[in-house]
Amino acid sequence: EEHHDFGYGLRKEFWHRGIVTEAGKAVVEQVKKDGLTYITATHDKENPRSGNVMKKLGMKYCYSYEERWQPKDITVIFRMYQLNFDGNDDRVYKKYWYQYENHFVEEI
C-alpha cells in the first residue's frame, strides 16, 4: 500500500510560534489538491505538543505502538495519526500495527 507520512522538525529556538502548524496547513492543502487519499504522521508519546499540531491539522489519533528507536537504542511509544481526504473515515493505515508486536489504542 502506498503511504505518505507527514514529518517535521524544528530547532528549539523556533518552538511554540505556530510555524509548524502554519506550514503544515499549507502542506495538507497541497497534498489534498494533488489527489492523495490520506496522510499519516507519528509522534513520540513524550512529545504531546507534536500531537497537538497533528490535531490542529485535522488528523485523528488511530493507535499507538512501541518501537526500539534508533540511533539511541531506546524504547519509544509512538502515536499514529491519520487524515483521510476522500471521505473514507474508516480507513486506517495498519503497517505499524502489524509491524510492531506491542500495539494498542490509548484513551487520549
Where in the sequence are the language-model features?
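Acyl-donor (CoA/ACP) binding surface of acyl/acetyltransferases
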Residues: 1-108
